[in-house]
Amino acid sequence: SFLSASKERRDLLLCQREPTIDESQKLCGDYGSFNTLVARAKQARDIFLVIGPPGTGKTSFGLLNILKEELTNPTANVVLLSYTNRAVDEICSKLVESNIDFLRIGSELNCDKAFSDHLLCNRAKDCRNARAVSELIANTRVFCATTSALNANIHLLKIKHFDLAIIDESSQILEPHLIGLLAAHTSTTQNSQLKIQNSIGRFVLIGDHKQLPAVVQQTAEESRVDEP
């Protein structure tokens, strides 16, 4: 996927060219203190980084407001990704609170029961045929998944174009887990010329490159708390 991607996308992912910015892009919504962040994310035509320590609202406000602004375009489609199922559950909870319809890629084993109705595999059971499934996918504007789940269902990127990917907790994700997704594309031939379209137009990476995972060095005996 990466090797056959367009030179422009390969150069971007390999840091061989600078990302482009379109300052003519203006906000359609009002996001209070997050207006500057959302505006800069919208103006970024390739990639945008959101960096901040834990508890600064990167997911609760940053991700959600960037998503809401993107959805002001009635034809825009967005995929929301993270490394762990727990992080995707958190994203799903924010979408439910905001009454944003979405589909989740994955299985019931890895999904909080509160969001099982949003699983594509469950929603597809109500579809009578393959055409109905295709219509469900085409008519849904927001998708959620772990990077592993989307990599396992990479064919989704062959049948649906996403204008934006927002990747939460991206500092936890190794490059090989992402590069195939960000380089995914479809190829068509027009007038004897090969035309390549990126499956994901722009992407926003959210995370904290200084954040370390929790490490427990105590034994279970030392960590045990007994009732007085």
Tell where the protein language model's regions lie, with residue ranges:
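Conserved helicase motor core of SF1/SF2 NTP-dependent helicases
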Residues: N73-A76, Y83-T84, S98, S134, ...
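Switch/connector loops and helix/strand junctions flanking conserved nucleotide-binding motifs
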Residues: V88-E90, C111-S116, L212-V216
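N-terminal pre-P-loop "Q-motif" helix
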Residues: Q25-L49, P53, F61, A145
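Extended, hydrophobic alpha-helical segments in both membrane/secreted and soluble proteins
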Residues: L37, V50, G57-I66, A87-I91, ...
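Pre-ATPase regulatory/linker segments immediately N-terminal to the P-loop/RecA-like helicase/translocase core
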Residues: S1-A39, S93-E97, I105, N110-N122, ...
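Inter-Walker segment of RecA-like/P-loop motor cores
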Residues: V96-A149
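Conserved RecA-like ASCE P-loop NTPase motor core of nucleic-acid helicases/translocases
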Residues: P54-T56, F61-G62, I66-V96, L103-G106
